[in-house]
Amino acid sequence: MKPPDKGLLLSSYVDFTIPSPFAREHLYYLIQYRRYQCVPGYEVERDFLDMYLCAYVRSGSLHTFCGEQSANATAGQLVLMDCRLPHRYYVTEPTEFLWFHFSGGESAAYVRLLTGGTGICFDGNHEILQYFEQIFYYGDKQVYNEHRISVCIQSVLCCLAVPDTKPDIPEVIRPAVEYIAEHFREDVTLETLAD
């Protein structure tokens, strides 16, 4: 189905799913998903929509506002929004992004956890993009599989909760951390670490 929104190129598409009663009660479920290619003039503004939005920017930038938070997501970044709050997003340059609306499972708790500390914009990675592609694949009417969709949505949220980065370890304690990692099966004393 072609979207009617201003600023969308004809190559954009929209698709919807109708989750089963089981999915609505027990799974993360997909409501609609889209690949948008848009130009300046594209804008969405709503006071309330009873679902959550996850968008992955492939090129350009997506300017977003949700509740009291705002972000400018650029290529390779992802936006996660609670659409039950007033929200707005728009582009100021040619932009391509993949996005889906979802709900169910522990969506509200996960979105609160993820956006409460770091905001609504996250760095994406190749793994997250693969989950988006799988969500779109399993959302297709020919292969529709709401159980796999649920796993993929949860996997995206999991990737955001546990980023693919290791914390910087201060140089002063790095030798102790490395020693513990190498000798974790042994009794390690504070005196040994101090040496």
Where are these predicted regions, by residue range?
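Short, conserved beta-strand segments within well-ordered enzyme catalytic domains
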Residues: A55-V57, H63, V79-L80, L98-H101
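An amphipathic alpha-helical interaction segment
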Residues: L98-A109, C121-R185, T189
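Generic protein-terminus/edge-of-domain signal
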Residues: M1-T74, V91, G116-G119
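ATP/adenylate-binding site constellation spanning eukaryotic-like Ser/Thr protein kinases
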Residues: S59, P94, I173
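Ligand-binding loop in jelly-roll beta-barrel domains
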Residues: S70, C83-S107
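Residues that scaffold the ATP/ADP-binding catalytic core of kinase and kinase-like folds
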Residues: F65, A109-V111
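Append "Primarily bacterial transcriptional regulators
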Residues: G76, L80, E191-D195
